Every structure is written in C-alpha cells, then in structure tokens.
Amino acid sequence: MTVFSSGVSRRGFLRHSAAFGLAAGAASALRLPAFAQSGLPDIQSVLDKISVKDYVREDYRKLYKMSDDPLWDPAKDWIRTVDWEKVRSEQSGKTVRFAVGAADQESAAEGLKPFEQLSGIKVELVPIPDDSFYDKAVSEFISGNASFDALQFFSPWLGDFAGPGFLADLSEYADKWKLPLDDFYDTYRLNYGYVGGKLVGIPFDCDVQMVHLRKSIMEKILGGPIDRAQSVPSYDELIRVTAEANKLGGGVAGVGLMAARGFWATYTWEHIAAQAGLTLFDSQWNPQLTSDAGMKAMDIIMALQKNAIEGVSGAGWGENRAAWLGGQVAANISWQDSGTQAMRPDQSKIVDDFVTIYEPRISGGVFAPPNIAGSTSCVAATSQNPEGAFLMLAFLTTSSIMAMNEANANGVAPGYRSVLANERLRAVSQPMKVWADSLEHAWCAPRIPGMFEMEQALGNEINRAVTGQISGKEALENNAGSFCPAWRASGIWSTADIFSPSDINVSFSCMASYLRFVQPILVKGWKYSRHSNGAGVPQTFMSRTLPGRSKFVMTLGSKFASSAICDIGPEHSIIMPLASV
C-alpha cells in the first residue's frame, strides 16, 4: 500500500528494501554496461539478469535454500513475451516522464535501467514530495499540461483522477502489446484498472487484509494445532480467544488492529463489515453505513478493542506492524504482508510462531476477504508519449518483478494468479495459499471520486468511538448524512436540473458533522483558462455552456487551500472550500 499523503506507508517504511517496485537486492544486477549510441544491449542478456539470483536478497535465498528457478510463469511474464524489437523500432530515442515520490527518486532511477536498455526509451523522473503527491498531481492535471506522463498512486484515489478524465485510456496499448490482464485476479483488474468501463490503470501493489494468529499462544487456548479454516471460524470466536489470550499476560495483548484516525480505522471497519454483507451505497447512492452490516462491524470492533494492545486508537500500519512482528499481540488484523514479513528473521521475532487463517465469518453474512488500499499505475491523458508510458508501467508491474518483490517481503504485493499459485513462492510466503483462495471472493470499496476523503472523515468518527468519546452507533450516524455525493449532499440543486446523468463526472464532498466541500465538481467538456485577477493572483477558470442554460463557471485559486466559487445561472453561488478536513 502506498499512501503518499501520510507519514507512514508500507512501502515508505521499507524503502531501504524496495526500489520503486524492484528489490534493492537487484541493484548490482541492474548496473549493466551503458548502451552505446550505435545500439542497445542484447535483449536476452538484459532479461537474463531479471532473475531470482540477481533480484532476491542473498540472505533470503540462503535462508530458504531458493534455487534460480522462476517464481512466476514465464509464459505469462509480460517482459518475456513482448516483442522488444518492435518496441525499440517504435520507441527508441523517445522519452517518458515518470512522477515519483521524492524519496524514491534514486531507487526508481536504478530500478528502471533495465527498461531503458530493453526499450531504448529514456525515463525522466519527476520527483514530487510524498506528503503532497495528491495535491500536486491534481493541480498539474487541472493545468492541462502535466509535467509527467505516468504515475503510480494509492488506488483509492483512482476515481478522483479518472472521473474528470485526467487519465488515458490504455485499452489500445494493452491489446497491441498483449498485456496479460486475464492473469490478474478480478478484484485487482476491475478495481485497480477499470473506471467507467475504460482501462485506465495497471494494478501494482495488490493488497488484501487478513487475520494472523500466534501459534504458541492460540494453540494453548484452542487445545491443539490451528486449523486455518475451522479453529477460529467466526468473529465471535475471535473475540473469545483474544480475550482469553489477553488474560495470559506476559507482555502479550490479545489482538492488534488499526483504529487510528482517518482511513486506518475505516479500513478496519470495512474489513469486518464486508463479512457481514456490507454494501456502502444502494442503487441510488444512498449511504448504508448504519445498515445491519455496518452496525454489526462497529459492535465487533468495540468488543475487540477491549482485548487490544494499549495504544490501538493511535495505531496505523506502522504501529500495528511493529507490535505484531515484535511479538506483542496474540492475533492481528492487518494486510497479507504481516504474514510474509513475520517469516523473515531480520524483520520478525515470531518466525515459525504464527499462521494466517481464512477470514472469520459473521452469522448471516458472506465470505468476503477485503481488498483494501493498494496502488495502481496510470498514464496522464495529456501525456506526450502515452504508449511509451504504458510500456514502462507494464515493465514495472510484470509478474516476475512482482513475484520477486514478494520474495523480498518488501510490502509490494503481486496480484497475478500465476504468481500466487507458484509453489516455490508459497514456500517463502506463508499467507499465500489462503491469500490466493480468498481473492476469488474479495470485497473492495468502490473507486469513486472522493472515496478516500469520505473514508478519512468516517475514520475520525470511528476513532472517537474507540476512544470512548461517542458510541459506535453515533460514529456511523454522524457520517450517514455526509457519506454521499456532493451533488446530493448540497441540497441546493438536483443534477437533473443542470446535467444529464451521462454528462456529469463529479467529485464527492467530505464532511464530518457539517457540510463542507473539499473537492471541486468536475464535468466532462470543461474549458480551462488561466490568467491573473485584478490583484495579480493567478486563477484557473473552468467553464462550460450547456444547451438552454447559463454558463456554468468555476473559479479556482492558485492553490487548493483556497476557495472556489460556482455560479449556477443568475441566482445561485456556492462557496466551496477546498482545504482538506
């Protein structure tokens, strides 16, 4: 999971062992001789170095006695099936500009050398500060002349970027270059790749949340070895056994879970609510937070937090990971990499003392392991070389590189069926069989504009419940009226009065207990213009004249921290603060 706007992400936390999707252990292998101006290196010689021997860390290879055999299916590994001679004939000498987090710039440059040698394309990196990646990307998109051709980002932002038309349709390139989309699990292909029926992304970091147990503790409580499907079949049983574990003492709490403010708490709620059959919206986009499924999840969270490690209300991924790998909890609700990393002695104190189980059930619910977070790879609609950008992203997400990321336990997860089915890789990734089985039934939050902001606001309220400020019911009720599209929440006009349903692509509002817009409404067909106002302040104007209507104008300040004014005809003006909640 990559979260550019927060202080801690799984990839950021492990930056020393990941090179923007490529393992740091590959650094020496990537230093191939620079290609001469008269020609490029031999293709096969470059591909031969993208191997287990050269990419997977030496200490891990020795620990697990790994052979040089591939951890992927070569017949489905895009870099080994694409026609690189054709790529060179069409793209050699061209340039692709790639937006990366500023802290990843050096590792990204190293990791992309093989692509440059295979394709003849020069990659220019456009560093963006990690804590302002979203705002910077949006402002560049709106300018109509983004400084980058491609970017990888947190997949919950996909709706924000795709809805207004900021991302290129990749379908033509995927067909031409035979990208193996059918090898991705449906949950990743559909939720990290497609928006409105168009392919706008290639899945990159493919996540699923899971439940992990400490064997030495839970086997005492359960009276024998842990059966991954039967020992803890329900959340009621998970509550019981973690309560028992909590009584054992010894500096080990019953359970770890993420309940920090913002999306962390929301993701825990979505994880559990999905098992109760949660549907976030009905067919009319009415929020379903206070449905039976939503309320049941809050009840379970409130029960589990009584058994949780101290400080759970401040736990995001980093804190949760440290507690689990440090042996401070008997059970953990987190991502799949909590299982892979727990196997690595340099990262974990619980090697050989844990097991990842199938998702516990809820009476009357469904089996719906949650695909939460993750990241995707996209091309800007304004790209100067969209085809070259696509080829670069296809290289970064190819199955061999993703498989070796998993072997290196760097938190960048593969989403390919052929990779997760590989028995050699399963031998070094304990959760993988349960993980692979679970993906056939995965649940995912919709990739709609503003979803991430809504999840942030909801998480703030859930955190208040966990800390005892309000009840679980109040946490959901406080967001029930605002967890909905801006055009419905405003109450000022109906979309039918201004736009046809096929005409509008909008961002969502993010509100806590009051109405507050944090993103502009963006509509297909807007015209963008930029000039200074009377005070000399640069402003961006977006306007559109609709048949039989007055011109619809939005004025944006020079920064997203300013306000926008929407004039709808001669009578209505709406001030829209754009600062984050």
Identify the meaning behind each predicted range.
Residues M1-G12, A19-A27, L32-F35:
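N-terminal secretory signal peptides
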Residues E110-G111, Y267-H271, Q275-A276, M295-N385:
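Extracytoplasmic/periplasmic substrate-binding proteins
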Residues Q117, E124-P127, A174-D175, D182, ...:
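Helix-loop-helix "hinge/cap" segment bordering the ligand-binding cleft or interdomain interface
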Residues K53-W72, Q336-I350, I362-N460:
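C-terminal lobe and pocket-closing loops
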Residues G39-Q91, K122, S438-P501:
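Conserved C-terminal helix/tail region of periplasmic/extracytoplasmic solute-binding proteins
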Residues S139, A146-D149, W177-M218, R361, ...:
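A structural signal for short loop-to-beta-strand junctions that line the ligand-binding cleft
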Residues K113-Y185, K220-I226, A323, A330-A331, ...:
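Extracytoplasmic "Venus flytrap"/periplasmic binding protein-like
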Residues V46-E90, S155-M210, I239, D353-E359, ...:
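Hinge/lid segment of periplasmic solute-binding proteins
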